[in-house]
Amino acid sequence: GRVVKDDTWPICYAKHSNAVVPKEHHLHEECGVFGVFSEACADVASLDYYGLFALQHRGQESAGIVVNDDGVFTAYCDEGLVNDVFPKERLQKLGTGNIVVGHVRYATTGSDRKRNAQPIVINHHKGRMALAHNGNLTNSYELRNELEQSGSIFHTTTDSEVIAYIIVQERLRTPSIEEAVYEAMGRIEGA
């Protein structure tokens, strides 16, 4: 076959049955993130479970869910498939809330150890935060070094924890979490 070099490669591929799709256009499984916000307190953990189950093809190394019930976080993460990590009894123990975020992991950075399961929960001077991330930072190494030199202690080998600490640093300087996230995005590179 011949290599198709076109920004509209799916269309070109369909037109040329002997075309070879460039490797950078192949599908890659790189984690899955699913979240729910509800105006009222609800069983958001079950909703998140089904969302993660649907995304499980994107990551089968670990799964995690964090439920926020008016600022009280209940979290559970472990290695394994969604249905193994969250049998009915464990899902019920997460309780109800109005915000939930979940993550299925496929290691692209860091190892596939349990400690790298997400979402990550961070306690800081102005509150708590749960973060789940799907992607890779291109300046993770530099940011991690900068953060460690300023006193941050890392518990994982993921670049997701780098993002969390950058957001926390910005949160200490800004009046809202939204502004902190906005400022943090200016410091990180990648996806």
Locations of the language-model features?
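Extreme N-terminal basic, low-complexity initiation segments
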Residues: 2-5
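Conserved short alpha-helical segments that host acidic/polar catalytic motifs at enzyme active sites
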Residues: 7-191
